[in-house]
From Swiss-Prot:
Disordered, as annotated region: 59-85
Keyword Glycoprotein: yes
UniProt miscellaneous comment: When the channel is activated, one or more imidazole moieties of His-37 probably become bi-protonated.
Protein name: Matrix protein 2
Site (Essential for channel activity, possibly by being protonated during channel activation, and by forming the channel gate and the selective filter): 37
UniProt family annotation: Belongs to the influenza viruses matrix protein M2 family.
Quaternary organization: Homotetramer; composed of two disulfide-linked dimers held together by non-covalent interactions. May interact with matrix protein 1.
Glycosylation sites: 20
Pfam family, one: Flu_M2
Topological domain ranges for the Intravirion compartment: 44-97
């Protein structure tokens, strides 16, 4: 017996659910959560580059530079920027002989 036949059964030539009590608070809550999950998933797929770039670069804060000389701060910024630049290059050229 498959899971499909246990959950959904043909009713008068149509596929339907045998949930007669759809006003149950648990069913309503599950429906709302399911709809919200679908909306968030669609938004994530549409804007994933913007969202993850924001989290990756925008929300990261380096260690406190209080009391650190300006030359060391500049060196740290250059290191961080070079790491970001290296991270953005996703493609590698490989030549085969």
């Amino acid at each position: 017996m498959s899971l499909l036949t246990e959950v959904e059964t043909p009713i008068r030539n149509e596929w339907g659910c045998r949930c007669n009590d759809s006003s149950d608070p648990l069913v309503v809550a599950a429906s709302i959560i399911g709809i919200l999950h679908l909306i968030l998933w669609i938004l994530d797929r549409l804007f994933f580059k913007c969202i993850y770039r924001l989290f990756k670069h925008g929300l990261k804060r380096g260690p406190s530079t209080e009391g650190v000389p300006e030359s060391m701060r500049e060196e740290y910024r250059k290191e961080q920027q070079s790491a970001v630049d290296a991270d953005d290059s996703h493609f590698v050229n490989i030549e085969l002989e």
